[in-house]
Amino acid sequence: MGRTLKIFAVLAAILAVLLGASVVFGTGIFARNSPSASARACPPSSPVTVGRIVVPAGPIAGYCQDRLINAAHVMMAARSLGIGPHTQAIGVMTALGESGLRVLDHGDAAGADSRGLFQQRDNGAWGTYADRMDPYISSLNFFTKLVSIPGWKNLSPGEAAHAVQVNEDPNHYDPYLPRAEAIVTALGS
């Protein structure tokens, strides 16, 4: 009994140290698609223009310019289809939930062939590899699919994202909406 308690105490101490480091450094267990630790102090950079959107160094909603540029591509793709800020936020929310606004060149649990901002699969529905890796084209493909869904305007943002992405968890995208709205508002003004 005494030995079991010692082992339990050692394991609990190790877990506490790991969780503490995760909280202090903003990495690890709880940071899969959260803003990077470096986003709290973005590197100085000149504004970049994506279409008509001027992207500052950041941070906006905890994200720096490298990821905000991708959000601007999502917004520009939506605008090219006549889609307003509310639905632009759905696209940004989805990209946050899928990749943390990064163009990922590797798969995820849903599929080893998933790529890009939206982790789109190589099943022919999302275009070529190059299309899936291009923030603007992959965003166009996302919004084209969204507007083809009957009644999409009546769906909540999370339901709309889920209808396109068919994530295992239909509520997966909901926590990303406030940051997406903040990004769209800041970049849209």
Model segments located where?
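N-terminal export and membrane-targeting signals
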Residues: 1-16
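Catalytic and binding regions of secreted/periplasmic enzymes and modules that target cell-wall glycans
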Residues: 132-133, 137-189
